[in-house]
Amino acid sequence: MMLKGLTAQYLLRRTYRVKKGDWILVTAAAGGVGSILCQWAKALGAKVIGVVGSEAKVALARREGCKQVLVMGKDDLVARVKEITKGAGVPVVYDSVGKETFFAALDCLAPLGMMVTYGNASGPPPLMSPMELAKRGSLFLTRPSLFAYIAKREDLDASAKELFRAVTTRKVKLHVGQRYPLSEAAQAHRDLEARKTVGSTVLIP
């Protein structure tokens, strides 16, 4: 809970502070961090557009709080986001996929929007010139990490307190999607890399 939950906390509350009424885009919306992001963002009053890797994950993403769900490889992400937001785009994208979604995610942003790339499930994002941000509407790009946000004890305590409050008030429910015996750890890694998993993955000794 702590690693994924604290990651969601700093993304939503500090990197870009989600506001009531915001349309936001979350990739890997059925994943471990993504599912927490979607639930928590909905509780904050945001409207979540979730991106998932297959049709099989659509229903789960909706249960986790997504108002709209798009499927990679099937939906045109940019066109659908612009349609959903009536041409405005979103103020923030939370992307943990990386290479496969990077440029499409940038093109989903409203002018002055923020691209938050916090994971590389499909490989690292491509190199690009800062001018790409300028020509897309003076966008902001950040690659945050949890440990910079909790380096000070007071920051860790405050973040953990907010996370536990979200869990105990049922704004966030932790979802274990699959369990593997420790002897099948290699298979668990293969399934994670192939993006076959949903929610959190647990290894059982």
What residue spans do the PLM features occupy?
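Short helix-loop-beta connector
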Residues: 17-23, 87-88
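Adenosine-nucleotide cofactor-binding segment
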Residues: 26, 42-101, 152
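Hydrophobic/small residue at the entry helix of a nucleotide-binding pocket
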Residues: 33
